Design a protein with these regions (language model features):
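Ribosome-associated RNA-binding proteins
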Residues: 2-178
């Protein structure tokens, strides 16, 4: 009588290291002097966070740019607020995103006037301004390129592809792709 050897049954589970998640949402607004002050107020009003002003590093005489000249401002949103904010900002563009705006690991879109954002009212001291929105995606394992000791490289297979971002945007955010 021969013993029958049972092979373990493999359960098809999704690899947790292949999961795609939204890392951060970055809002950016440019301008110099008076427009920069208005941009800082606008981004603070939209996010409720502290805004960082961006200064130039290079000298470009044809544009009148010198090192240390403040040219724009930015806010990075992480944590639980990022999805709520991104859904709200997509409301300004009628929940639509052009496919050509999606790149590997991120997508970006612009909002021409902040008045298009739901629940935003006209602010007399700000006037009419627009802003840029960038959403960055990541997989687990990115720490390899961020750590100081024994730093490694992120292989191409760990990048988030355009198709995966399209899937995330349509399923989780309910955005229509054009």
């Amino acid at each position: 009588m021969a013993k029958e050897i049972k092979k373990p049954v493999k359960v098809e589970t999704e690899n947790p290291m292949r999961a795609v998640k939204l890392e951060k949402v970055v809002l950016n607004c440019g301008g110099s002097a008076e427009k920069l002050e208005k941009s800082v107020k606008l981004l603070g009003l939209i996010t409720g966070r502290k805004v960082k002003e961006i200064a130039s590093n290079k000298r470009i005489p044809s544009f009148g740019v010198r090192p240390g000249l403040k040219l724009g401002c930015t806010v990075t949103i992480r944590g639980e607020e990022k999805l709520k904010l991104l859904k709200r900002l997509f409301g300004a563009v009628d929940n639509k995103l052009k496919r050509k705006k999606i790149k590997e690991n991120h997508f970006s879109f612009g909002i021409k006037e902040y008045l298009e954002i739901p629940d935003m009212e006209y602010q007399r001291d700000i006037g009419i301004l627009g802003l840029d929105v960038t959403a960055v995606f990541v997989r687990p394992g990115k720490r390899v390129i961020l750590k100081k000791a024994k730093r490694g490289r992120l292989p191409v297979k760990q990048h988030v592809t355009i198709a995966e971002i399209e899937d995330f945007v349509t399923n989780k955010l309910g955005v229509e792709l054009e």
